[in-house]
Amino acid sequence: MSTIPTDLKFASSHEWVRKEDDGSYTVGITEHAQELLGDMVFVELPEVGDSVSAGAECAVAESVKAASDIYAPISGEVVAVNSSLEDSPELVNSDAYGDGWFFRIMPSDESEVDALLDAEGYQDVIDEA
């Protein structure tokens, strides 16, 4: 069982967000999600400049087991993508909360972050699954 970082917020669909110094939010999938998916073989990311809506599909993670849609945890504009995942999708497995991030969003409504789960709330989601 992995420890869930307390400095992040989480969506029940297993994405995490971290606020950055410039006001954007980095998005990735949780350790729990990557464990369920298994070894990543391909990641399809949104384009910089794309507008995304909270709860909408915006990326795909393909593993040896399955392909899984990745949902935007908050609405806003994609301001960066982790191009390292194109050549090294396994970074999602080795460092889900660090080098395995997917993209960054500049939020259009920062109050949406308040609706996300804290570490304890996300643990409850995992426990109920």
Curated annotation (Swiss-Prot):
What CDD domains does this protein's entry cite? GCS_H
* Occurrences of domain Lipoyl-binding (ranges): 24-106
Q: Give the top-rank taxon of the lineage listed in the UniProt record for this protein.
A: Bacteria
> Does this entry carry the keyword Cell membrane?
no
Annotated disulfide bonds: none
| UniProtKB keywords | Lipoyl
InterPro entries, A to Z: 2-oxoA_DH_lipoyl-BS, Biotin_lipoyl, GCV_H, GCV_H/Fam206, GCV_H_sub, Single_hybrid_motif
Q: How is the cofactor bound?
A: Binds 1 lipoyl cofactor covalently.
N6-lipoyllysine carried by residues: K65
Q: Which Pfam families match?
A: GCV_H
* GO cellular component annotations of the record: cytosol; glycine cleavage complex
| Known role | The glycine cleavage system catalyzes the degradation of glycine. The H protein shuttles the methylamine group of glycine from the P protein to the T protein.
Q: Its quaternary structure?
A: The glycine cleavage system is composed of four proteins: P, T, L and H.
What family, per the record? Belongs to the GcvH family.
Instruction: Tell me the HAMAP family matching this sequence.
Output: GcvH
**What is the name attached to this protein's record?**
Glycine cleavage system H protein
Q: Which organism is it from?
A: Shewanella denitrificans (strain OS217 / ATCC BAA-1090 / DSM 15013)
